[in-house]
Amino acid sequence: MSNQDALSNTMYDILNAMGKDAEFLYDTIDKYIKDAQDANKQYLVDTWQKIKDDKLNHVSMLKDALEKEIHGQ
């Protein structure tokens, strides 16, 4: 495997950040939203929903960055 084929530090960083955001989105955030709903705390529902929306945006940004890394831009 040539050095160019190896996973670069920047590509690793992107994948690592995507993994952390994805784990939070798919394993955690909906439970937090439900807990806030069950506690009848709309301000927390809104807060967690905003965080979820932001994380989804971050994942999209990281996906775009990863595509640029893959294509050498």
Question: What spans do the regions from the language model cover?
Answer:
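Iron-associated oxidoreductase/ferritin-like identity signal
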Residues: 1-73
